[in-house]
Amino acid sequence: MGNNPSALKRARQNLKRNLRNVSVKSELKTIEKRCMSLIREGKKEEALEFFKFVSKKLDTAARKRIIHRNKAARKKSNLSILLLR
């Protein structure tokens, strides 16, 4: 780690951003698992409503560059394929 003020500030910012990104990624994993479980249980209407919520969260994370936009698209595609079966 650097010793000048700007390097110290960057280190603080990186730590704060890392904590926020880890939190968002964890939330994404949790809601994806919940959507998968709704699909597996056969609750199509609930799963469809929840898919819209998951889709919105994935797009937001991609827009903020927490995850790559292609990853968000892939996750949404896989969930929608499972939902339509």
UniProtKB/Swiss-Prot annotation:
Gene Ontology biological-process entries: translation
Pfam families: Ribosomal_S20p (PF01649)
Domain of life: Bacteria
Alphabetical UniProt keywords: Ribonucleoprotein, Ribosomal protein, RNA-binding, rRNA-binding
UniProt cross-references to InterPro entries, sorted A to Z: Ribosomal_bS20 (IPR002583), Ribosomal_bS20_sf (IPR036510)
GO-annotated cellular components: cytosol; small ribosomal subunit
A GO molecular-function annotation: structural constituent of ribosome
Family from the record: Belongs to the bacterial ribosomal protein bS20 family.
Role: Binds directly to 16S ribosomal RNA.
Record's protein name: Small ribosomal subunit protein bS20
Gene: rpsT
